[in-house]
Regions:
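Short terminal hydrophobic/aromatic SLiMs and anchors at protein ends
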Residues: 2-3, 14
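Short, positively charged and aromatic/hydrophobic N-terminal segments
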Residues: 10-16
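Sequence-structural signature of the catalytic-core scaffold of metal-dependent phosphohydrolases
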Residues: 17-51, 63-74, 83, 94, ...
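Short glycine- and acidic-rich boundary segments immediately preceding or forming the N-terminal edge
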Residues: 82-88
Length: 250
């Protein structure tokens, strides 16, 4: 709650507000992941002469990507649909981005009233959420969840002889969310389609903050992930930088 101020006096800032301001500053980080060999660091990369914010760049990278366009060929499951204009993953992603825009506007209204975010940083909330909404299904394989199960089944049979190799375990528990993080977080292999999102957009993207290494092969139950073993070091550094790690390290 903002304190009342007398005429001619500045508004007092409570310790709670200082903490929230610092937290938002971390959450709205414009930094991007930089991978060099085994080393993971961050850089404030901005295209020269680009008037857009780093978060608008995230949004644009998704819109103009081939992976995003391919979502038009991936349908959502609609058994016995009554109409012939059912959703595909592309139209669904556009709708999710629109919902994220709506939620972001409400968040902006609240933080603006509370004074939790510097005025010049408030727009970052909207763009990072829209970018995450637009890209949230970009890692989905063909046939969606059925495709995930097919990959898991193939890896379980094919990789059985390789034992506990972490990469094979990634395939055994394959999840489109983790594949999306892989595509959106990395900056290496320039000839590949890596988007190198800002940390703020990556934080908005993650729905299930669990790692593939925490699931044993063949374990029962739903296995929704944030990152594969190949991106575990990246995920941990991003999560720590955003201040999303609990006191117990989880």
């Amino acid at each position: 709650v903002l304190t009342q101020r007398a005429p001619g006096r500045k508004c007092a800032i409570l310790p709670h507000m200082e903490k929230m301001t610092e937290r938002w500053e971390r959450l709205l980080s414009p930094l991007r992941v930089k991978v060099e060999g085994e080393a993971v660091s961050f850089e404030d990369y901005r295209p020269r002469g680009d008037a857009r914010s780093p978060f608008e760049v995230d949004y644009g990278r998704v819109v103009f990507s081939s992976a995003f366009r391919r979502l038009a060929r991936k349908t959502q499951v609609h058994p016995f649909a009554d109409v012939d204009y059912i959703h595909n993953r592309l139209t669904h992603s556009l709708e999710v981005a629109s919902l994220c825009h709506t939620f972001a506007k409400e968040v902006q209204r609240i933080v603006r009233a509370r004074g939790d975010v510097a005025p010049e940083r408030i727009e970052a909330i909207d763009w990072s959420m829209q970018a995450a909404g637009l890209a949230h299904d970009i890692g989905n394989p063909a046939y969606g969840h059925s495709g995930e199960e097919a990959i898991q089944s193939w890896a379980e049979k094919t990789g059985a002889r390789l034992g506990d190799d972490p990469v094979w375990n990634d395939f055994r528990v394959f999840d489109g969310n983790a594949q999306a993080f892989r595509l959106l977080a990395r900056n290496d292999l320039r000839d590949s389609v890596y988007y190198c999102f800002t940390l703020a957009s990556l934080g908005a993207l993650v729905k299930h903050p669990r790692l593939a290494s925490s699931f044993a092969a063949g374990a029962p139950g739903a296995r929704k992930l944030a990152a594969f073993s190949t991106e575990e070091a990246i995920f941990r550094k991003v999560w720590d930088r955003l201040g999303l790690v609990r006191a117990d390290g989880t």
